[in-house]
Amino acid sequence: MTQRFSFELTATDGRARTGVISTPRGEIRTPAFMPVGTAGTVKAMLPENVRATGADILLGNTYHLMLRPTAERVVRLGGLHRFMNWDRPILTDSGGFQVMSLADLRKLSEEGVTFRSHIDGSKHHLSPERSMEIQRLLGSDIVMAFDECPALPATEEAVAQSMRLSMRWARRSREAFGDRPGHALFGIMQGGVTRDLREESAAALREIGFEGYAIGGLAVGEGQEAMFGVLDYAPGLLPEDRPRYLMGVGKPDDIVGAVERGVDMMDCVLPSRSGRTGQAWTRRGQVNIKNARHMDDPRPLDEACSCPACRSYSRAYLHHVFRAQEIIASMLLTWHNLHYYQELMQGLRTAIAAGRLGEFVAAFHAARAEGDIEPL
């Protein structure tokens, strides 16, 4: 890999930005939504189908992959891209959030975290250095610094201590990452909903220096108003010439609001998880295809959508296969949801480039306010 990681802004509209991240494995158009392939797969989707929705990049999970099948096995089999048959960019998270939310018997220290697997109870250790090693073995294009995610609710003092530990770990992550042309390391801003802590965290990250910067510690139950309150200032604390990644977001209206406030990248399990439970995201809002009102409805889920679920199947069929618990139900609705999310991102990119984001956002909210079509 001789090409280096780079980011070019091509247009702005207010605080919103559009641009291109260039990597040796391809370009990522921003604002970008990254489907989540937790264990090396986006559930219910083939990689080529994920690409067909318009996705430029996938997210993989360090915690899950280190436990099963293990990073050492993945590298012996040619790296994560070959292993999961995805030749485009991959971002891997550091494992910190999952250690705090999933693992058992955690023991946190300055060195790192010792924990037991939620799968089989086996004992493991994650540190900034080990997280960087695992992500190097996986071969991800964008690597996330190892951070600590405090359980909420937490006192401001606890959030401050956690943030400062994460900043020390960020420096160790930077040192352990080394010089890897073509790959990028992103630092993660923490600090909860307290502006002083966010400013302190951003200053520490800028001093260390990263190829991109993430806003962590949001979308963890604080509510949209509080999240947007942080996003009103947090992106502006980060370097303008580097990508800004909001972790774990989210619902379509969260995404639109984040883009308006200067965010370039997002990820969330929501579209795929919702698809597996019969929840469809459409331009008119959310639709529960399992509701009886769809049982005899010959119309598509969304007549303006070109995904296979809308192009070739009726609401009645989708209702039937969910009620019958057929595998195709999860496949079709996951494809639809990911397609809708990528269409939303393309609409945002086009609107920003044309200087018409305000019109796009107004139309987005107006369509959702109308709600789903009337039953037959």
Swiss-Prot record:
Detail which positions bind substrate.
D93, S94, G95, G96, F97, D147, Q190, G217
Q: Which organism is it from?
A: Cereibacter sphaeroides (strain ATCC 17023 / DSM 158 / JCM 6121 / CCUG 31486 / LMG 2827 / NBRC 12203 / NCIMB 8253 / ATH 2.4.1.)
Pathway of action:
tRNA modification; tRNA-queuosine biosynthesis
Instruction: Provide the taxonomic classification.
Output: Bacteria, Pseudomonadati, Pseudomonadota, Alphaproteobacteria, Rhodobacterales
Q: Kindly state a single biological-process term from the GO annotations of this entry.
A: tRNA-guanine transglycosylation
Identify the enzyme class: transferase
- Per its Swiss-Prot or TrEMBL entry, what cofactor is needed? Zn(2+)
Q: Does the keyword Nucleus apply?
A: no
Family (UniProt)? Belongs to the queuine tRNA-ribosyltransferase family.
Q: What does this protein do?
A: Catalyzes the base-exchange of a guanine (G) residue with the queuine precursor 7-aminomethyl-7-deazaguanine (PreQ1) at position 34 (anticodon wobble position) in tRNAs with GU(N) anticodons (tRNA-Asp, -Asn, -His and -Tyr). Catalysis occurs through a double-displacement mechanism. The nucleophile active site attacks the C1' of nucleotide 34 to detach the guanine base from the RNA, forming a covalent enzyme-RNA intermediate. The proton acceptor active site deprotonates the incoming PreQ1, allowing a nucleophilic attack on the C1' of the ribose to form the product.
Binding-site residues, Zn(2+): C305, C307, C310, H336
What segment(s) does the record annotate as region RNA binding?
248-254
Give one Pfam hit by family name.
TGT
What are the entry keywords?
Answer: Glycosyltransferase, Metal-binding, Queuosine biosynthesis, Transferase, tRNA processing, Zinc
Q: Indicate what this protein is called per its UniProt record.
A: Queuine tRNA-ribosyltransferase
* Subunit structure of this chain's protein: Homodimer. Within each dimer, one monomer is responsible for RNA recognition and catalysis, while the other monomer binds to the replacement base PreQ1.
In alphabetical order, the GO MF annotations are: metal ion binding; tRNA-guanosine(34) queuine transglycosylase activity
Entry EC no(s): 2.4.2.29
Q: Which residues form the active site?
A: D93, D267
Q: How is the cofactor bound?
A: Binds 1 zinc ion per subunit.
Q: Which reaction does it catalyse?
A: 7-aminomethyl-7-carbaguanine + guanosine(34) in tRNA = 7-aminomethyl-7-carbaguanosine(34) in tRNA + guanine
Q: Name the GO cellular-component terms.
A: cytosol
